[in-house]
Structure formats: C-alpha cells, structure tokens
UniProtKB/Swiss-Prot annotation:
This is DNA-directed RNA polymerase subunit beta'. Mg(2+) binds at D462, D464, D466. Its cofactor is Mg(2+); Zn(2+). NCBIfam families: rpoC_TIGR (TIGR02386). One of its GO terms (cellular component) is DNA-directed RNA polymerase complex. The gene is rpoC. GO terms for molecular function: DNA binding; DNA-directed RNA polymerase activity; magnesium ion binding; zinc ion binding. The lineage of its organism: Bacteria, Pseudomonadati, Pseudomonadota, Alphaproteobacteria, Hyphomicrobiales. InterPro entries: DNA-dir_RpoC_beta_prime (IPR045867), DNA-dir_RpoC_beta_prime_bact (IPR012754), RNA_pol_asu (IPR000722), RNA_pol_N (IPR006592), RNA_pol_Rpb1_1 (IPR007080), RNA_pol_Rpb1_3 (IPR007066), RNA_pol_Rpb1_3_sf (IPR042102), RNA_pol_Rpb1_4 (IPR007083). DNA-dependent RNA polymerase catalyzes the transcription of DNA into RNA using the four ribonucleoside triphosphates as substrates.
Amino acid sequence: MNQEIMNLFNPTTPAQVFDQIRISIASPEKILSWSYGEIKKPETINYRTFKPERDGLFCARIFGPIKDYECLCGKYKRMKYKGIICEKCSVEVTLSRVRRERMGHIELAAPVAHIWFLKSLPSRIGLLLDMTLKDLERILYFEYYVVLEPGLTALKDRQLLSEEEYLRAQDEYGQDSFTAMIGAEAIRELLKGLELEKLETHLRAEMQETDSDIKHKKLAKRLKIVEAFRFSGNKPEWMIMTVVPVIPPDLRPLVPLDGGRFATSDLNDLYRRVINRNNRLKRLMELRAPDIIIRNEKRMLQEAVDALFDNGRRGRVITGANKRPLKSLADMLKGKQGRFRQNLLGKRVDYSGRSVIVVGPELRLHQCGLPKKMALELFKPFIYSRLDAKGLSTTVKQAKKLVEKERPEVWDILDEVIREHPVLLNRAPTLHRLGIQAFEPVLIEGKAIQLHPLVCSAFNADFDGDQMAVHVPLSLEAQLEARVLMMSTNNILHPANGLPIIVPSQDIVLGLYYLSILREGLPGEGKLYGEMAEIEHALHSKVIHLHTKIKYRCEGMDEEGKPVTKWYETTAGRAMLGQVLPKHPRVPFDTINKLMTKKEISGVIDQVYRHCGQKETVIFCDRIMALGFYNAFKAGISFGKDDMVVPSSKWKIVEDTRTLAKEFEQQYNDGLITHGEKYNKVVDAWSKCTKKISEDMMTEISAVKKNPKGGEAQINSIFMMSNSGARGSQDQMRQLAGMRGLMAKPSGEIIETPIISNFKEGLSVLEYFNSTHGARKGLADTALKTANSGYLTRRLVDVAQDCIITADDCGTKLGIKMRAIIDAGTVVASLASRILGRTAGEDLREPSTNRIVVKRGTLMEESHVDALQQAGIQEVKIRSALTCELVNGICGKCYGRDLARGTPVNHGEAVGVIAAQSIGEPGTQLTMRTFHIGGAAQINEQSFIESNFDGKIVIKNKAIAKNSENLSVAMVRNMVVAVVDADGTERATHRIQYGARMRVDEGDMVKRGQRIAEWDPYTRPVLTEVEGIIGFEDLVEGQSISETLDESTGIAKRVVIDWRSTRGGADLRPAIVIKGKDGKVQKLARGGDARYMLSVDAILSVDVGSVVKSGDILARISTESAKTRDITGGLPRVAELFEARKPKDAAIIAEIAGTIRFGRDYKNKRRISIEPMDKEEETREYLIPKGKHIHLQDGDIVEKGDFIVEGNPAPHDILAIKGIEELAAYLVNEIQEVYRLQGVLINDKHIEVIVRQMLQKVEITDQGETDMISGEQIDKIEFDQINAKAKEEGKKIATGTPVLLGITKASLQTRSFFSAASFQETTRVLTEAAVNGKVDPLEGLKENVIVGRLIPAGTGASMSKIREVAIKRDKMILDEREKQAAAIVPTAPEAEPLALPTPE
C-alpha cells in the first residue's frame, strides 16, 4: 500500500511542542520506564533466516516489527490488525518506524559506575565523596576495600584496606564488628549515605573558617557540586548504574552484505560484550563461584560498560576485528563527524546542483545563467504539477516520460516555472553571508552556470575552474526571503565595513580609467560642445580624441530638482561617463570629472547609493560595467617587454650601496661595531637602495612623454594597469623592472645579500636559489593559514551566535569615548570614520561656542559627522555594544547602523554572527608568521616627532633639564606635548620619549612639519637629575663590568656584565652615584639618593670623578639587543587577543599610583614595591627577573596603569587596573592594527560585539548574604538577578569583578549547554549539564538549529514575536471565558438520586 495513504489512516502523533530542554541523570526507574523489555541474549539476527533472535539485541517483541503492519511469523498482515499482539511470536502489529524509537534495557547483575561521572575531570563522584580518583578506581576495579561502618574498631570511616589488611582486620576485630565493601556496590552505598543538606552546612562553615586560598577553592568546588545535586533533583547514587539502556535497533543497524557477511554498527559489538559478561556473571553467582572469579567478572563487566559509554577513556581502547577502535556512544556525539556537527548543524540538502562557472557580462545584476539541463532536473516536481494542471499528463509516470523525452511543451513549462522563482548560488568556502546570494535564473544552453562579473568579489570567485552550487528555495516564504533579503541587488554594501562590495575590478576598471584620461596638446583641444550627440559625432569623424581636453555644457539638477546647466572642462570620455550617472543634486558631474581609479569608482558608487537609493545604484553599476568592458576592448591596452622601464640610475645606486656595505664590513672587522649592528646597517642600506630604485622606476614609467606633434603620448600600459588598481602593484612592478631586493630565510631573518637583478634582466643562479626560500615558505604558509583562519571563524561564531538585536533602546547612560587613532603622527583611523553610523552617547557641543551640534541619542549620518568635524570636536562619547544593558541581546541604539543596508539596524538582526564573519572572513589574507624584527623592519623606527598642525605648544607634566651641551632634555616618561590651535582646541598630542632632545618650549608657535623633539632610536639613556661628581658602586672589573679596548680608535668601552654569573658577584648591586663637593651622595628633589642602578649590557658614558650636569647621560642601553624580539603578527596575534592569552614577556603594570621603592632582591629577581599616595591602599610588591630592564629609579612617581616593565600588556591586567572601557579600546586597537597592516577594513562595532561576549562573567569577590560562593564565576545577568532579590529581602548583596574570558572558554560557558556541547569538549559539557540538571532555554541560533526550529533571528524573530503575542491572547481569552462561565452557572439545588428500575 502507498505510504501516503497509510499516513492518512495513521495520523502521526503531533510533534512535541516545547520551549526548553532539560538534561539530567537518568535514574534506574526512569530507564525502566523507557524500556520495552529486557535484552537477555547477545544474539542479533539469525544468519539463515535474517530474522531477529528473540530476546536478542534486535528482538522484534521488544522493539517492534521489521515490516510495516506485519508480525514476525507472518500470521497477521495488513492494517486491519493494527495494535494486535501476535500470540505466536508476541510481536505487536504496527509501523516498523517504532524500531527507531523503542528502547530496551539490560539488568546488570552488579552495579557499575558511569564512566563520565568518574573519569571526566573533575571527577564528580570523587568531588562528592572527597576521595581522589586513584582511590576510587582502586575500589571500583576491585583492588581495595573501603570501610563503610568502622563500628567500635580502630578503623577509620572511608579507610582503604588491601585484601591482606581486610582479612587481618576481620581476624582481629571479628567478622561483624565493622562493614567494608569493594567495587561499585561500595561506592553506591557511600553515595546513598550522603546527607547533602548537612554536608552543605558543614562545607559553608569550613569555608568561613579557612584562611588558605587553595583549601577555599577546593571547598568551593565541592560546595558547588553538592548544591547542584540538591537543587537539580538528581540523586548521587544514580551515578552508579544498575540498569543499562539499549538504544533502538534502527539507530545501530546491522546490514547483510552480499557474500553472507554483515556490516554492523560498533555499538552492537559493545552491547554484546556487556550482555555476555553480564550473563556469565549471573551464572557464576548462581553457581556460587569463588569470590576471586566473581570479582574478576564484575571488573570485566565494569570495563565493558565503560567501553560502551566512552571507549578509550580508561585503560586500553577496545578494538574490533581489524584493530580499529570501536565507536562508543560518546564518540557518536563528539567531533566533526559526530552527531552534533555532522547531522544536526550541517545537513546535505536536496534540490541542489553544482557546475563550473563562466562569466556572463550581458546579465543584469540580479540574474544568473542556469543551464537548461540543470533547471529541468532541479524544477522537476514543479514541471510535473504544471503538466498535470495543463492536462498534458494524467499521472506522474506520464509526466516523467514527457520530461525525459524533452518535448517542446516541457521547455515552455520550464520557462513558466522558472519565471520569478529565484535560486540561491553558493561558492565554497562560504566565509561570510555574501557567499550565498539569490539570483533570478535565465535559461542558457551549455552546461556551465553564468555569473555576473560584479558579484565575483563578494563570492571571491574567479573563472579559472571554480565551481558553484545552486539551491532551489521551495516554500513561498523561502522564495520571499530569497528575493527580499538575499537578492544580489540587496547586497551592495559589505557588512564588515559598509563600503560597496559591488565594485568593478580588473578590465572594467582599466576601461573606465582609459576612458577618463585627460591628455594635453591633442588635436581639437579647447573646443566647445553643447550636447553628447555632438561629441559622439566629433569622435567618429576623428576631430577630437577620447582624451582631448574640451569644454562641455552639462545638464544637472539643483537642490529643488530643477534642471541647471553648467560648463565643465572635461574630455569626451568623461562626458560619456557622465551619461550613465543618475541625475541628482548631490551627485554632480564633478563626481566623475577626474581620473577614475578603482578607489574613485568605489567612492562614486557609495555616493550614488547614499543619495539616489538602491535601484538607481544597481542600474548605474550595470551601466558602468558595460561601459568599462567596451572601453577596455576599444583601448586595446597590451603589455610588451619595453613597457617595463629599468631606471637608468639603477647601477649607480647599486654601486654606491655596495661601497657602503663594504665600509660597514670594514668597520666590523676593525671592531668598531658589533656583528648585530653591522647586520642592521647593511640590511638598512640595501632597503634604502631598493626603495630609491623603485622610486626612480616609478618616475620614469609614469613620466608624461610628448609625441612628435607636441601632444602627450599614450601613458605606459603597465603603469595604467597598476595605477588604476586593475592589476598589479608598485611592488610587483619593482620586481619586474627595478630590483627584487632583500629576501628572507625560512626562519624569517633577512639575508644580507639582496637580489640585485629584476625579472626583465633575469636572475643569476645564486639569486634564484636565494629567492626559492621565500616562495616555498609562502606556499606552506597558505595551506596552514586556511585551516587556522577557519578555526578562528568557528570559535568567533560560537561565542557570538546568540547576540541578536532584541530591542530598540535599552536606555543606558553609559558609552565609550572615541577619538582619532594617530600612529607616529599620521592619522590611521579618523574620528569621522569611527563614529559614522553610531549613536551619540551625550549632547555633543562645539568647544568654542558651547552650542549643541548633535543631540544625545542621534544616529550619526554623514551630515552629522561633517558638522562635528567643522566644529573641531576631538572626542565623542558614543553608545556601544559593550555598554548595552539589555539582558538578552543588544539594543538597536547601542549597535547603530546596519552596515550592509546603511539604515538603522532591524530587530532580530544576528549581529553576533555578522561580527564573527566580518572578522573571520579576511583571516585568510592575514599573515601567519611571527616577525623577527631586524634590518628592513627597523627602518620605520622613528627618531623624531614633527607637528602635523600649525599652533601653540602646551607641555603637560613638564620636566626639562639643560645638559652640559646646553640642549634641552626630557627628564620624565609621562611628559606630553600638545599642539593647540587659536580656539584652544587640542589638535594633536605627542608623548615624549625619556631622554629626547626638545626642539620647542612651552608657548612656542610651531608650523606644520616643524620638529618638536628627536632621540636616538637605537639606545635608551640613563640620565642624571642632579649635578655633581660621578662615583661608582659595586662596579668591579671582571665581576660586574668588563672593559674592551677598541684597537682602531683606542677608546675603552665599559659594559656591565651579568654579575650573578661571576664568582663572588651574587650580592653586588652595580650603580652610579652622584656626589656633592663634600663627597656625600647627593639627594634627589623627591627625597631619594642620587643612585642609578644599572642593568646588564648597559654601556657606561662617564668616568669616576667626572663632573656632570642634570640631563647628562650616565649610561646607555642598546635597544638593538631588545629589538630582535619576535613580534607576533597576523592571525596568531588576532587569536592571542581573542583568546585573552597572556603574552610572552608581558608588561608589568602599576596597580596603584604611588612612589617606587626598590626592596631586597630575592634569589634572581628584583623586588619593587609601590608606596601608595592614597594612605588607605596597601603597598603592592612586584618581583621582576633581573635581566629585564626597569627604567624607573627609586623614588620615581608612577600613575595607576603605568608600565613598570615594558612589553605587551596582558588583557586581564588592563581590565583589573583600568577597567572595561580601557580594555575594550586596547583590544579593538590591537586587533584593528593587525588588519590595518593588510589593508583590511573592519568596523569597530564588530570587535566590540565579540569583546562584549568575552565579558559576560563576573567573579564573586564577596558573597554577602546570598547563596553564591566567593571565587566562583557566574553570569552577569544571574548575578544581577540574585542581587536584586537579596536587596528586596533586605540582605547584604554580593560584590563581583568582571572577568575576561577567551572566546573558546566563553563559548564553553554559555547558558546553552546544547551550543557548548556542539562546540568542543562534548563529554565535559554534557556531564556538567546533567549533574546540574541544566535547562536550555533555546535562545541562541545554534540550539534552535539543533532541535530543528526556525532560528530566533531575522524572519524567525518576527515569527516568535507573533507566537508570543498569540499565546498571551489565547490565555486572556481563556481566562475571560472561565470568568464568564463561573458567573453564569447558577447554584443548582441538590439533585435527587435517579430511581433506577430494579432488575427482575
């Protein structure tokens, strides 16, 4: 009978409707209630009849029939016997589908421990009983007895006894004087005997008493698990199993293969092993076998059950016939191939096809070419239904035949079906949401899918053999979403940065660039044209050239929309470009009246989108694409050998550099400079040489040449390609026609000898060999990068997946301050770019007049940002995802503008996932390597500060001394020079290096480009603050100082050596002191002695007895040694920041403001303490390894947050010392830094969303009168709720500090255990969730995908909203009805009993 008809008669039970899912430990009673019968035999199916054995693992009596509505012996067949149990074979006649749902069980002859609660660390059983895992295993695996009741004997409670000790104790005290047991029974008794309430009171009391930190932590852990058992309704003894559930047979199938063999699921083997051992144990017990045999059997049973639940967690892995480990129940869930990730989160879909893509330049932006053959297959059901509706076929079979024969009417119907039915195109890897877009299919001949050229950058596709997949949205809702949300015309802007992503590239750019070139001196220059037709005529008759400078009268629009005409100096090409520009007052002809490079074109598209809207933009893009292709073809730009111009000055520059390098070599041989310095200088010289040659080559290539008639000649083709942004970069041109330059070794160091040849001249054998290192490393890196970047994206998505816009405004007053990011004097990210599309967190006032420019709560558009710039506002407080106060999700105001649409963000937008994709997608472009900074990278070491603005100098924390050479020297580390304009607005601030020579003073006027200060970038000085005579302390020749004589100059150089490693030098403390005329040590202004400690490798600049003035250099520390440190860059750096790892050589940060004091050294560490200014705080102490250079002196004053030892700060320290805002600013800037280096633009808000997710937890510092445990980490939301409740009841509230978690850790600690379990460490997450009886409220995206519902984002969010409203209304209506019913029913009088007729 047909399946559909059966389903009519058998309406399936409606799917359960649920709002949340709870997980807990199953009690034996629960397992029995699930079970349909006990499995007694290990047999599976009979190998001859293929029928399941009775009471075996596939028993039909327990699990249900094998065929629909047919018992095993065949007595009852068909539907009419539904529900009957056959008396012969005892099988219920029903659907065979029940074999996927019905469970069985195995009654164990002896209890066994559940391995997850035993071995999944921390061991839950161990924590509850306060026993070590080792002891537990000894008891469980029958090595030791445990005393349960010591009675009146000298034994202790829970004491372990070996076999001998046990027998001896029995002899000594008598058999019944104490109780001791062994195995899982013993543990079960112990767990049963726990009184959780008493235990909890006892633990809390103990925690109050203890002072030891470690003990407190241990007690807190126990307390937590005791509470978990108390409140979750789980009983501790359930962790020991007496019944094992057996999963339904169709979930562990056994399939006969041809040749009489069977393919089976590993679970069957594991179950068989359990049943065999269990049956053997039962038999041995009946036979009253010796204890030792029974014990061995019990141990084997425990091992069999362990292997079934989690093979390999304890002891040897149990393997199958072919030495392959068997897949246990836990393995079914874990990892990429497990249930969660393979089947629940990612499924394969039908109605899909894939093919190679080719370019479709004649398509419109919303179209794609779909091969007819493919369309016919994909839309088959639709075609069948249309054929049926038109009466061309009566049955599906007939329709099938028609389609197979490809009759003409089938093609007509296909056209009908496809019309306005969008399809989804996807290119793997789908790194961000633009990797799947919807298009309207256009039927084409051939077998390749045609793709519109402008969407290639979104898909990251090219036509060198890429394949794409097509999916058909079936339901009406799906088609609607595809059209309204996913259509390629709706994805013009990039969600990561809000810039257009539908941007012309390559040939289109080249064509448009060629079209917009203006060349002087061509025939017809200066002619006047009134309209386009005249220009076209002139072009055809060769009166003018495309590039001739002409005057053109162009019609535009004014603000009211009235036409205005204006004369422009332009070219014929640009006039043609002006034809496709939409008419709008904000998009005048000037927009395109310039040389169009890729960047310019992108700007024009952005402008058109902002002012003219989406429809106009799409039409404009299609038009300029056509124009670009056409002109690229007309231009006929090609590229010959002579277009690569080798600069004439090349060999002279090379020769000069060679001489210089020889000089450095000579200096090294003479001992004037160290090897490191020589290496740095040589590499420096070659970098400069490469740069110079490259600059000369660019000037020669881009030079404007004249043709014989005096006009400008055609521009160099290669220069056009590179300059327009179509293909190639200056760097590649340098390698073609300049010199290849320096190469790196595989280790990342730079090879001293550069490659002098370029590709045009050809490389020598040695040069070629040197260049293979880098190339090979590049390929290896790329392979690793892809995997790493993918993993980063996965972690980001997982941590942010439940971040959704759930409300318009949370009403918070908080926000973060934004200012332009300035690096070494250049603006890297302007204030305008950072605040565009964000909400103002306060009224923004113009500093000079105090008038409000932007009101609080305004979403800042381009116009507002311009106004702020004109008002000269330097710092803006904006709302941010970090400070949003919503309980679930983020509010629209704190998020700001939806970057992909340019409008305020919608409800239900999954901003977390968008943020994760925006950060993860460019991951593959980041580098993988850690840089060894040396030579080439050192050129960008700055040695001066220039002013970027005209203005007046203001110096904060001023401390300047005049030294012996009468130069002004900066004497403190926190001196800041600000440049102030006429209104008193700070235009720029610069932090001055310690020891820098100042070129300006307070109140000086500076011009733009004037130097403010300069310093030696290669050394760090130690300066004196007082004048006097030099004295040495503990500077002993050969112990703490070594003198080297430079032969060529005869100068002695004294360097401090590591005094701890020399004999008798352990207690030395080398220093320079400044003495007065009386021979006493001078005092500093702030009270300490003028004694300057020296660190290893310091080079002395003074002698004993010489006179110094304040500001003179006593010693200098070469930073060259500090400079070859590894700098983690690229992907590893991003991962390090998001994982909140402590960096190697972390900086030490002052936790309080105060005075530095050096204490007694401890082993090989320096002891530094800070005496607080605020007398109520306590002194903080730091131990610092002696090799590290501490640039502070005794008595220096530090601010909170100052670095005591330089380095990368650990994010946790920043959070603890400076707070959330500083931490966020640090993380955002550091991450942006990495992306900026690669030229990737990402909006700050994406990083803020991720950082918000990393700051979800609070660590309890004081529990107050709540049930929380101090030291535990708890969700912010939960923390606030508990505190609010305590406040209501008038109790003392708890206090906590925010904790920063890395993204992996944060994902594992989300409120949803489903989401965490499907991410990583499945076993641990599920064990913990079960012990706590956790409830998953199904709020995030992941959990909803897993249980197969609409996700609560996008259209799913609106659906759930509607559902909520409906439920509320239903409740109201029902309540009303009940009220009315209660009101209507009158109180009836007592009814008389009915008189029943008495039976005869």
